């Protein structure tokens, strides 16, 4: 418990300086320390730094964006051997960056994390993209003319996607036809957004495995990153209820309903609140 408490404190301190010290690697390593309290962060930071220097060298003679992307793909996927884990997609190790570095495999967002770090250091105009169901990377040439931008699928060896490809993926991921709205479906994800989505992936996995305490930790970290994430506040309330922490559950669920009005899960949330009242564990106003 002491080790986790220290990791929790370190993550809070990291969040406090995040807008000043722009460091994605530190953040994902702290998430890995949730699982591995004795993780040697310096070892993995040095490994990423070594990869970064190699990427800079590989891209030093490139000029165009296509040349840079091809060189980065050659280094990251072919030379280093990173690839998407399509055999066991929901293995939580795909989300812990230390495991991704050791095993050379991951899911879209964990591979994108490393790809972005290497690309940024090498002068690539890359951004993370919060595409539904499948994190992407964008080369953003211009914020005014999106036709000059490129979309990269790091889960599939850096394949460049057209907007038509992305439209087809959107329909597949959502299970229905929906018009692609770039301003909505292709929103940039800064460091906070990348960490938030990484934690959400782990939260979903651990909740499905019945590891409620782990899912609660991840939810609390998501709230540190985005305090007005009302869905995460609801989840914190539900996880707290499952763990018998009724006062926390009441506070979270009542605040969730207050902030969201009458959400789609209004009845279910009230059912939990009344279940606690029936046990005489809380008082409802």
Pin down the residues of each PLM region.
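A structural boundary/capping signal
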Residues: 1-285
């Amino acid at each position: 418990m002491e080790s986790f408490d220290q990791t929790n404190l370190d993550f809070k301190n990291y969040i406090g300086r995040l807008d000043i010290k722009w460091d994605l690697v530190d953040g994902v390593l702290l998430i890995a320390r949730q699982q591995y309290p004795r993780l040697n962060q310096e070892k993995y930071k040095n490994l990423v730094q070594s990869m970064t220097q190699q990427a800079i060298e590989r891209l030093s003679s490139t000029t165009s964006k296509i040349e840079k992307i091809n060189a980065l793909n050659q280094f990251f996927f072919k030379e280093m051997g990173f690839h998407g884990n399509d055999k066991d997609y929901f293995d939580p190790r795909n989300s812990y960056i230390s495991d991704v570095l050791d095993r050379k495999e991951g899911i879209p967002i964990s591979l994108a994390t490393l790809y972005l770090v290497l690309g940024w250091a090498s002068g690539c105009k890359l951004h993370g993209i919060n595409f539904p169901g499948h994190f992407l990377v964008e080369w953003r040439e211009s914020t005014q003319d999106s036709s000059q931008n490129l979309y990269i699928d790091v889960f599939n060896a850096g394949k460049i996607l057209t907007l038509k490809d992305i439209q087809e993926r959107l329909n597949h991921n959502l299970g229905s036809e929906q018009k692609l709205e770039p301003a909505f479906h292709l929103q940039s994800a800064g460091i906070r957004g990348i960490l938030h989505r990484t934690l959400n992936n782990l939260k979903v996995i651990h909740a499905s495995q019945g590891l409620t305490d782990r899912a609660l930790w991840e939810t609390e970290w998501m709230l540190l990153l985005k305090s007005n994430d009302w869905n995460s506040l609801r989840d914190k309330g539900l996880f707290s209820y499952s763990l018998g922490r009724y006062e926390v559950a009441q506070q979270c669920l009542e605040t969730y309903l207050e902030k969201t009005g009458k959400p789609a899960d209004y009845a279910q949330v009230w059912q939990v609140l009344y279940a606690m009242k029936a046990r005489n564990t809380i008082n409802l106003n």
